[in-house]
A protein has these predicted regions:
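Polar, low-complexity loop segments and adjacent catalytic/binding residues used for recognizing
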Residues: 1-271
């Protein structure tokens, strides 16, 4: 399995603290593989951590942030062929397929189902082996996530995904990654261009759009992360052991007193 990464910020190698932004991605996917004999696609990220190699298009699973996936290989379709199709044809997706996922670190990306269980939305995007430029834009304005494509050679954006109520913290990193397995393809990221968008907000919107510290989507329940308990200090451990011993001694003394009292009462019955 081969992975390729381009993990960096678009603004001077620092985290992105823009409130409203637009990321334009100029990319190209091409190769010699015929239908469904190529893979696996590329991902564009806005995440808390820099690149950590893993199974999700080359990045770590259970990431924290936003992932946008240009998936070129239909894993679920192959599963369905083997299992007599678990879904009706009406819900089949045509690949290549673009989807988005917001994660707070608690969710796993399901490769066998091409991310369907955690998908915010998606669209078909025929992007392989085209003879003109292909672009993808991710726009985040007033907690509104919009993804558009320019893949027809007409220099026109067409809607792909639109999700309101997306809450993304500031200070995360932009990056791209790709991965191949038994099949392969060429995934070229030609440019990443980040733009700050100037947006006016009413006082009410200012209150509603305060900074958040964990990614989430309104009306979508994400499992809460449970923080591990901090290790006990030496003093705390000593106090626990000390009071446990005191309690044990106290219990033994009470037990002896009650036993002696019971014996005295037993003797009185015989005299």
């Amino acid at each position: 399995m081969l992975s390729c990464f381009c993990w960096e910020t678009v603004t001077d190698w620092e985290p992105c603290f823009l409130r409203d932004w637009e990321l334009q991605v100029h990319f190209r996917i091409h190769g010699q593989g015929k239908k469904n004999l190529h893979g696996d696609g590329l991902a564009i990220w806005y995440t808390k951590d820099r690149m950590q190699p893993g199974p999700v298009f080359g990045n770590m699973d259970k990431f924290v942030g936003l992932g946008v996936f240009v998936d070129t290989y239909p894993n679920e379709e192959k599963q369905q062929e083997a299992q007599k199709r678990r879904y009706s044809p009406g819900v089949q997706r045509v690949f290549p397929y673009v989807s988005a996922m917001v994660n707070n670190g608690s969710l796993s990306y399901d490769h066998e189902r091409d991310g369907r269980p955690t998908e915010l939305g998606g669209c078909t995007a025929i992007v392989r082996n085209l003879h003109y430029d292909t672009f993808l834009v991710i726009r985040y304005v007033k907690r509104h996530l919009t993804i558009m494509m320019d893949i027809d050679g007409k220099h026109e954006w067409r809607d792909c995904i639109e999700v309101p109520g997306v809450r993304l913290p500031r200070g995360y990193y932009f990056g791209t990654s790709s991965i191949t397995g038994d099949l392969s393809d060429n995934h070229d990221v030609i440019s990443l261009k980040l733009f700050e968008l100037t947006v006016e907000r009413t006082p009410e919107e200012e209150k509603l759009h305060r900074d958040v510290f964990l990614p989430s989507v309104d009306n979508m329940k994400l499992p809460e992360m449970t923080a591990p308990l901090p290790p006990l200090s030496g003093l705390a451990l000593f106090l626990i052991v000390f009071f446990s011993l005191v309690f044990s001694v106290f219990a033994i003394v009470i037990g002896i007193i009650l036993y002696n009292k019971w014996q005295d009462q037993s003797r009185k019955r015989f005299y």
